């Protein structure tokens, strides 16, 4: 069983944390993030670190212990370095471009797909076939990238579609005569 919760979360220079009840607020150079923990754990600020301890020995308390510690670590990472997902578009005529707060995708449909970018996330297109999603909220960055990818998932025969930069597409052989 993992004991990731035992390890305290260090606060780098330029990052401050404040705890009020079960809510942790982390401020850093990229912004401010908050997280509300369950009553199964206790959160304390000790000597430049955030320490999470379980209340009791129940299974739920032990589960929340590691999860809350990981969430606090993600808050610190988000306000210092941020999170980034890169997508690649593969296919003839498939391309993307930003127009204000809308990502326009040409994906082989009879119409262009207009994807509204939510607040808290920055989407850029360095090339017509590359999309970069950045932000301080790991869950939101991942969800936006997944929503963009969902418009045209990579297919296994030619590999056409939108995929993550490091994703491997298992290729299938076509029919034989």
UniProtKB/Swiss-Prot annotation:
Keyword Transcription regulation among UniProt keywords: no
Record GO biological process: cytoplasmic translation
Name of the gene this protein is made from: rplF
Keywords, comma-separated and alphabetical: Ribonucleoprotein, Ribosomal protein, RNA-binding, rRNA-binding
GO molecular function: rRNA binding; structural constituent of ribosome
Coiled coil: none
Name of the protein in its database record: Large ribosomal subunit protein uL6
UniProt-listed InterPro entries: Ribosomal_uL6-like, Ribosomal_uL6-like_a/b-dom_sf, Ribosomal_uL6_a/b-dom, Ribosomal_uL6_bac-type, Ribosomal_uL6_CS
GO cellular component, one term: cytosolic large ribosomal subunit
Keyword Ribosomal protein: yes
Family designation: Belongs to the universal ribosomal protein uL6 family.
Function: This protein binds to the 23S rRNA, and is important in its secondary structure. It is located near the subunit interface in the base of the L7/L12 stalk, and near the tRNA binding site of the peptidyltransferase center.
HAMAP family: Ribosomal_uL6_B
